Design a protein with these regions (language model features):
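Long hydrophobic alpha-helical segments typical of transmembrane helices together
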Residues: 110-152
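Short terminal or interdomain "cap/linker" segment that borders an active site or interface and mediates
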Residues: 94-96
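Short, charged beta-turn/beta-strand-edge "cap" motif at the junction between a beta-strand
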Residues: 49, 87-91, 133-136
């Protein structure tokens, strides 16, 4: 387990879907910091246990970028984009990637271990950010529409 900052008002534990399933914890995909209605857990270490009543999440995949980068890409904070990746026989299109904009960020995409392992690359991975629809686009709704015969 890694301990990461910044320090927050409430303790948060980010896990992969695989880990939540192994531990029998409900998988709740959320943006970092959005912990209302999430399960808790007991954290055990060499100096004892800490029980947190909420805060276990599977972090929603996201991109950090600066305001200048967001302006250049015509993307706003909390927009959702697609990221097309290239790898050796396992290229992926990541959907529903939330963009987080802040002056202290630098351009980087954050995915969990499961998502990183699905991408096969022995070099530094890279991707192309694409917006197919408006900032309020929802992939789940698109799939439901397609299955219902509604074509966009």
């Amino acid at each position: 387990m890694a301990l990461l900052g910044p320090f927050r008002k409430n303790t948060q534990v980010e896990m992969s879907l695989t880990d939540t399933r192994k531990l029998g914890i409900p998988s709740v995909i959320r943006q970092s910091g959005d912990i209302e209605g999430t399960p808790g857990c007991i954290l055990s270490g060499p100096y004892g246990d800490i029980e947190i009543p909420k805060g276990v999440i599977v972090a929603k995949r996201h991109i950090h970028m600066t305001p200048d980068e967001s302006l250049a890409l015509h993307i706003k904070d909390n927009d959702e984009v697609f990221v097309l990746t290239k790898s050796y026989g396992r290229a992926l299109i990541y959907a529903d990637v939330v963009v987080r904009v802040h002056r202290n960020y630098h351009l980087a995409m954050h995915v969990d271990t499961d998502e990183a392992n699905a991408f096969n690359s022995d070099t530094e991975p890279y991707g192309v950010i694409v917006r197919f629809f408006d900032s309020n686009f929802n992939t789940d709704k698109w799939i439901e529409d397609e299955l219902s015969g509604i074509r966009r």
